[in-house]
Amino acid sequence: KFFTVFFSVSYEPGEHQIKVEINTRKTGARYEMKSYLGIPMLVAGKESMLAGKLVAMTRRKEFVSRDLYDTHFFLTQRWDIDMNVLTSYQVKSLKEYLEACVTLIENIPDNVLLEGLGELIDEKEKVFVKNKLKNDTIFLLKVRADIIK
């Protein structure tokens, strides 16, 4: 990957790994100081996280279901979208970009929605992902686009 420092941490064989990706591209993202297990670290602000997730969803060569899952979560939390991040990726109109996200999601085959997510979520969430995730996310994006002048 370009502009990315990546490493993976595994505590035990067979257990989930922690993957850490650090984007070194200048994106205009805003960061906040957080403490995790007593270790201070800079973490992208909510608005920057949502903008970054939208960019990831639309820029990847292949669909990654966690992008859709995370986008849905962020939208349900009513987080704002950091336009500085989108502008760094040459996005000129938020409304048009959200509409492009809707089109992309509409074209995702239903049979790939659980890929990469199935082992991370419980049965109730799997049912939600299979039956509602796409339509709910599309609805939330359309509502967000509709309130933009």
Question: Language-model segments: what does each one mean?
Answer:
Residues K1-K149:
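Structured mid-to-C-terminal alpha-helical surface segments
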